[in-house]
């Protein structure tokens, strides 16, 4: 998830598609009356079959505009290694793009967009503005994989959701982002520590850390809201959907829900007992993270699965970075301990007016093959939406192994929320979170500040609201 403006790091490119769409993006200008609902009759066509469900033409080329961010573009090039096994001579020509909207908006207006677009990055095109110009992708999930399995059956639950707008599934989000709490397996084993499953256990661990001259947590000023994510994840597990929906819909008193308050009170206790590395609110976030990953002065750190790649140059040798789900407030939560926040990101779209939309869909089918998905995980150290493509050793990445295990253990108990991104609340929320973690604001003050931020958006009639149910 994106946490700070002006950044093209892994979090930026994984941010949920709905964020840009809901904010009334400038991309509405992409729509034109002449192009709306008009599918291209030109371009190569092939005969539909089990191996060619979309009728992509043999020996044709797919123009793909791919966001050149943290994942690069080579993983889409890799599709060429498998495409030919299904449609003879079909090739994808990848064009790396950083500024998606500025470069591709004119092509939508002109009626000649690329065949496939990775609509990611800081300049992502708003989906609502081009919704009628995009192919729906339900038939992709009904098609078979290159291994002969129905695609809908081999992906994680809920992966359609972030790519569905006004009941139209138009964006395939390819990468799974897993959120959890991270620790050094080596350090824990050396000290006989057990990763906490409840907040009470985390408090006990904090006391053990102090005996060793260490801290439980650390935070950096730009990433103080990672603890907001941890708070919300734990609160949703404790209180269930009513907590998630109240926050998503900016309801009055949403931050005062008992489950939310229960976690805030424990966090407040941890701050008062000096279980956070001091000075975090004045420390650049990667330097703060290095205090955990390299100096090992802190035991735990809440983050998304990007953390290993982000800190690979500042992680102690044999750290064995491992993730666990967020802690539960009690031993009888609404959702089990294994439940976690995970979301599909990196949205791919197929414009109707591309020269080869059938080929664009076929490239996506190729990317969902076991071979292509495994290649992505091996080279990018991140899971795709395709289940079962990461080996037991995680290609040597303990973080990747733990992400896969967490997803498998969660089963259908996977949730997500988007209100922070949808309404651009992170910058405002950073202020009270930094004050709270520094000990300058108590739990009551944090609650009041967060509620005021939600209330301001809810009561602003100029802001389009997204009703979540």
UniProtKB/Swiss-Prot annotation:
Places the protein is found: Cell membrane
Disruption phenotype: Disruption of the gene delays (GlcNAc)2 consumption, but does not affect GlcNAc consumption ability. Deletion reduces the level of chitinase activity induced in the presence of (GlcNAc)2.
Post-translational modification, as annotated: Predicted to be exported by the Tat system. The position of the signal peptide cleavage has not been experimentally proven.
Cellular component terms per the entry's GO annotation: plasma membrane
Keyword terms, alphabetized: Cell membrane, Membrane, Signal, Sugar transport, Transport
InterPro entries assigned: Bact_solute-bd_prot1, Chitin_NgcE, SBP, TAT_signal
Domain of life: Bacteria
Induction annotation: Constitutively expressed. Slightly induced by GlcNAc, (GlcNAc)2 and chitin. Repressed by DasR.
Skewed-composition ranges (Basic and acidic residues): 35-48
Signal peptide: 1-37
Pfam families in alphabetical order: SBP_bac_1 (PF01547)
Coiled-coil regions, chain positions: none
Region ranges (Disordered): 30-54
Oligomeric form and interacting partners: The complex is composed of two ATP-binding proteins (MsiK), two transmembrane proteins (NgcF and NgcG) and a solute-binding protein (NgcE).
Family: Belongs to the bacterial solute-binding protein 1 family.
Function as written in the Swiss-Prot or TrEMBL entry: Part of the ABC transporter complex NgcEFG-MsiK involved in N,N'-diacetylchitobiose ((GlcNAc)2) uptake. Binds (GlcNAc)2. Can also bind GlcNAc.
Protein name: Diacetylchitobiose binding protein NgcE
Annotated source species: Streptomyces coelicolor (strain ATCC BAA-471 / A3(2) / M145)
